[in-house]
Amino acid sequence: YGVRGKRYFAVGFPNVTGGYEIRSRFFKGCVPPKDVSLVKAEGSPADVCSVFEGFMDFLSAATLGLEKGDCLVLNSVANVEKAMRYLDGYGCIDCYLDHDAAGRRTLKTLKGHYGERVYDRSALYDGCKDLNEYLQLTTKKEQ
């Protein structure tokens, strides 16, 4: 993309309605429309869907080998209602949400709608803001 004659580069992550979440070291934004992103597992239909707030957390889960089944990225906790039409068919919903008020509200909303099918997986990264921060810290320790 370009701003005032300068060229910049970013990673784009597509959503279900044709928009993109855009990230670089210097920029965080989206190309509308804003919506959730769904990544389907290869092979037969999945009974498990892992839910992430942002695509960096999804990529962190992939790096850590955590994703099993399908994955849904909210791209904003404001999209939790939009996510529900995609989550209805899953027997297990694994939530890797941020350790903040918005993440807790989102988990509460999902548990209120899906009950015992929702699992909070955030204990994995206790002491970190989110899964991406956990990956960064564990990667630094290994170096």
How should each PLM-predicted stretch be described?
Residues G2-D88:
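Phosphate-handling DNA/RNA-contact segment within nucleic-acid enzymes
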